[in-house]
Regions:
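Hydrophobic "anchor" residues on beta-strands that sit immediately upstream
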Residues: 32, 137, 157, 350-351
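H-loop/switch region of ABC-family ATPase nucleotide-binding domains
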Residues: 382-384
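Walker B catalytic acidic pair
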Residues: 354-356
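Conserved NTPase motor "head" modules and their coupling/switch loops across ABC/AAA+ ATPases, GTPases
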Residues: 1-58, 72, 93-97, 217-227, ...
Length: 410
C-alpha cells in the first residue's frame, strides 16, 4: 500500500474550539471521523460533538458500515469479524473476489476526545506483497505503531448487533468470544494469551493426529496450554466476578443478572492457587493424549468453558428466557460492562448499538436512552425509524444515511 495507504490514516487537526468545550468528564467521544474507500464509502467525513449519535436511514444505506469502521479503532477484527480485504469499497457490480492488482487500500481515521485530551487514531488495510499475510497498519498521533494492540491504550469500545441477539441460544463458542471481548477491554494482554493458547492447542492436535513420537515437543505445547490456559480462565473469572456486581441490581427496565464462567480449569482455580491448576492441567493433557488423538479433539481446557447467564427476576437460565427477556439481558450485560469500564478506567467507553430500537417497547427504549445519557458515553445508534429516537431530541446529534452519504439533521 505504501504512502497511499498511510495517507488514509491522517486526520487534519481538529481546531474548532466550539467542538472541544463539551467533552463530558468520563466520556470518550469521536470528534471527527473519516472513512476512505471503506465498504460503501468512497470518502466520508463527519464532524461531531460529544453527545450520543443517531444514524437513521433505509436498510442497506450504510449505517452499519459506519459502526464497523468505528469498531476498527480498537484491536481485533471489527464487529463483523470480516477479512480485511472484504472491507474494501467495491464499484457497483464488482465481484467480492477481485484480482490482487485491483485491491484498493481502505482507511479509518478519527480524532478522539477524552478527559485526558485529544488523540489522532488511524488504521488502514495494507495489501501484503510476495504472498505474505495482509495486515492492518495503525497510526497514533501521526506515528506508525508496532502493532494494533496499542489502540487499547487509547480507545475502549463495546458493541451490540442484531447477530448477537442469538447469543444465549447458539453454541458456547460465541459466548466465549463475547466474554473474551469483555475481558480484553479491561486487560489488553488477554488477546495474546488466547492466541498463544489456541496456537498450542492446534499444534498439539496436529501432532497427535500425525502420530508424532516427539514427546518433548508435545510436553512443550502442553506446558504452553497449561500456563496460558490457566491465565485465560483466571482473567475470565475475574471479569465475571467484577461484572456480576454491576449486574446484580435490577434497574427496572433491564433485569438483574447472574453471570459465571464454568469448566474444569475454572474449578481448579477455585480449589487452589494458579500454579496448582497449571500442574493439574498439564498432567491431564499428558494423560489424555491417546483419547484426544482417537477423538480428534482436545476435550478439556478453557476452549470448552461455558459462559452462563441467569435472569435474577425469574431465576431462569438465559437460554430458557423469552426473546424479549434475552434482548433485555444482553443490553444489561453491555450496559453493565460499560459502567464497569467507566468506573475502573475513569472514562466511559464508546458504545455501538446497531438497530437497538428493534424489538424494544417504549418503556425499555426510554430507559435505555436515560441510561446512555447518565453514563456520559458517546453512544452510536442506528435505526430505520427516526421517530423511535424522538426522546433524544436535544440530547443527541442526528444524521441521515442514504446511498453511502451521511447528512447532519439540524
Amino acid at each position: 500500500m505504501g504512502s497511499q495507504g498511510l495517507a488514509t490514516l491522517d486526520t487534519p487537526p481538529n481546531t474548532d474550539s466550539d467542538t472541544n468545550s463539551d467533552v463530558k468528564a468520563g466520556g470518550l467521544s469521536v470528534r471527527r471521523l473519516t472513512l476512505t474507500d471503506f465498504r460503501c464509502y468512497h470518502h466520508q467525513r463527519m464532524d461531531l460533538d460529544a453527545r450520543p449519535v443517531v444514524l437513521t436511514g433505509a436498510n442497506g444505506a450504510g449505517k452499519t458500515n459506519l459502526l464497523e469502521g468505528l469498531s476498527f479503532l480498537v484491536p481485533g477484527r471489527g464487529l463483523r469479524r470480516a477479512r480485511l480485504a472484504d472491507m474494501m469499497r467495491r464499484e457497483r457490480g464488482e465481484d467480492i473476489d477481485v484480482p490482487p492488482s485491483q485491491v484498493r487500500p481502505w482507511g479509518v481515521a478519527a480524532t478522539l476526545g477524552s478527559p485526558d485530551g485529544e488523540v489522532e487514531i488511524g488504521t488502514a488495510y495494507e495489501k501484503a506483497a510476495n504472498g505474505n499475510r495482509d495486515k492492518r497498519i495503525v497510526k497514533v498521533d501521526g506515528e506508525v505503531a508496532k502493532s494494533q494492540a496499542v489502540l487499547a491504550d487509547h480507545v475502549s469500545v463495546l458493541w451490540l448487533t442484531p447477530l448477537m441477539d442469538r447469543l444465549f441460544v447458539e453454541g458456547p463458542g460465541a459466548r466465549r468470544r463475547f466474554l473474551d471481548g469483555l475481558v480484553f477491554g479491561s486487560d489488553p494482554a488477554h488477546a495474546g494469551r488466547v492466541k498463544a493458547y489456541d496456537h498450542a492447542l492446534r499444534e498439539r492436535m496436529r501432532l497427535l493426529r500425525d502420530g508424532s513420537k516427539d514427546l518433548g515437543w508435545l510436553a512443550s505445547l502442553e506446558d504452553t496450554m497449561a500456563t496460558r490456559g490457566v491465565a485465560v480462565a483466571a482473567a475470565r473469572l475475574d471479569v465475571t466476578r467484577r461484572l456480576g456486581v454491576q449486574l446484580a441490581a435490577d434497574t427496572g427496565a433491564f433485569p438483574g443478572a447472574a453471570i459465571e464462567v464454568a469448566g474444569p480449569v475454572e474449578s481448579w482455580l477455585g480449589d487452589g492457587p494458579a500454579l496448582a491448576a497449571e500442574d493439574r492441567f498439564r498432567a491431564v493433557l499428558a494423560g489424555a493424549r491417546g483419547s484426544d488423538a482417537a477423538e480428534g479433539r482436545t476435550t478439556i481446557g478453557p476452549h470448552k468453558s461455558e459462559l452462563m447467564v441467569r435472569h435474577l427476576g425469574n431465576g431462569q437460565a438465559a437460554a430458557l428466557c423469552s426473546t424479549g427477556e434475552q434482548k433485555a439481558l444482553l443490553i444489561a450485560l453491555v450496559l453493565g460492562s460499560a459502567r464497569m469500564r467507566a468506573q475502573e478506567r475513569g472514562c466511559a467507553p464508546m458504545l455501538l448499538l446497531d438497530e437497538i430500537a428493534a424489538h424494544l417497547d417504549s418503556h425499555r427504549l426510554d430507559a435505555l436512552f436515560d441510561e446512555i445519557i447518565g453514563l456520559g458515553a458517546q453512544v452510536w445508534m442506528t435505526g430505520t425509524d427516526s421517530s423511535l429516537f424522538k426522546p433524544l431530541a436535544g440530547r443527541a446529534q442526528f444524521f441521515n444515511v442514504a446511498e453511502a452519504t451521511v447528512t447532519a439533521v439540524l
